[in-house]
């Protein structure tokens, strides 16, 4: 039996704000969207353009005005930067670097909802 990665889901409070953040911070773009007929949820699937793996952003109407409990934020996705120094400079200008370990050559960025993403060389 074999499995392959498909997607990771994150619930967000403002779908467009999150789409804009991921486009600017990580170069991800929307490849598919879906909205429930009753308007109770909206989905946006983002891609890096090089793999079939997707980041699914979910907006829930009944949860749009309250923060999600992210626990201790130890679960995260990691991205490899083709140009680490340029990526670091870009994220520093955006003001989204939330943790850095220069000895290990990595840092984390935080999205508008507080999710952390690791950036490595």
Question: Where in the sequence are the language-model features?
Answer:
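Acetyl-CoA-dependent GNAT
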Residues: 58-63, 121
